[in-house]
Swiss-Prot record:
Keywords: Chloroplast, Plastid, Ribonucleoprotein, Ribosomal protein, RNA-binding, rRNA-binding. It comes from Triticum aestivum (Wheat). The keyword Ribonucleoprotein applies. Belongs to the universal ribosomal protein uS3 family. One of its GO terms (biological process) is translation. HAMAP family: Ribosomal_uS3_B. One of its GO terms (cellular component) is ribosome. The gene is rps3. Its main location: plastid. Residues 50-74 are annotated as: Disordered. This is Small ribosomal subunit protein uS3c. PROSITE patterns: RIBOSOMAL_S3 (PS00548). InterPro entries: KH_dom-like_a/b, KH_sf_prok-type, Ribosomal_S3_C_sf, Ribosomal_uS3_bac-typ, Ribosomal_uS3_C, Ribosomal_uS3_CS. Disulfide bonds: none annotated.
Length: 239
């Protein structure tokens, strides 16, 4: 029986790279991993805490003239909706944190970075190390599976049909520089008692080709009927 491996880990070292860059003694390695998790969780919690409740942001779709009203009200299940990934680089006295984000409006506010650095300093409680945080805006947000998954989550929470939500998400990738995309949703779709899985695919998706650059994410969506699982594969290019 065939086993499904994570597409990102399968390509680590070829088309995918590590998100943490540091060296440590073997006995201190576990502490470094726990520290990385604390840093990432602290950043996600900061964004969730400082998000204005009920404020709306309009995102103009690249694929059509449709303007999507994107509700910024957050719940406990979607604290990192606009962060694609966080890179951590550790030196002797400095921890460099690079936040790759699709819509960095919140972190562009005056004093936001300084406040986040103070929160991280308290969380890690490291006297000899200081934090250096930088923000990198993703050039093509709808080329990122995390952002597409969050968009689908927003649609489903607003009682939009799951098939319509998947089709709209694929439409957003039309003008992005990609060669294939697949969206899969599993769970009690439409409130049915029996769980099932539905998927839509467009273009190529060579999962067994290691040199193929494929982005992937798995995203849980909490609804009144239970938790739905969204998986998105995006075939960017082939090296």
């Amino acid at each position: 029986m065939g086993q499904k491996i994570n597409p990102l880990g399968f390509r680590l070292g070829t088309t995918q790279k590590h998100h943490s860059f540091w060296f440590a003694q073997p006995k201190n390695y576990s502490e470094g991993l726990q520290e990385d998790k604390k840093i990432r969780d602290c950043i996600k919690n900061y964004i969730q805490k400082n998000r204005k409740k009920g404020s709306n942001r309009k995102i103009e779709s690249d694929s059509s003239s449709e303007v999507i009203t994107h509700n910024r009200k957050m719940d406990s299940g979607s604290s990192s909706e606009v962060i694609t990934h966080i890179e951590i680089q550790k030196e002797i006295d400095t921890i460099h944190v690079i936040i790759h984000i699709g819509f960095p409006n919140l972190l562009k506010k005056k004093g936001a970075i300084e406040e986040l650095e103070k929160d991280l300093q308290k969380e890690i409680n490291s006297v000899n190390q200081r934090f250096n945080i930088s923000i990198e805006k993703v050039k093509e947000p709808y080329r990122q599976p995390n952002i597409l998954a969050e968009y689908i989550a927003f649609q489903l929470k607003n009682r939009v049909s799951f098939r319509k939500a998947m089709k709209k998400a694929i439409e957003l990738t039309k003008k992005a520089d990609i060669r294939g995309v697949k969206v899969k949703i599993a769970g009690r779709l439409g409130g049915k008692e029996i769980a099932r899985a539905e998927s839509i695919k467009k273009g190529r998706l060579p999962l067994q080709t290691i040199r193929a650059k494929i982005d992937y994410c798995c995203y849980p969506i909490r609804t009144i009927y239970g938790v739905l699982g969204v998986k998105i594969w995006i075939f960017v290019d082939e090296e």
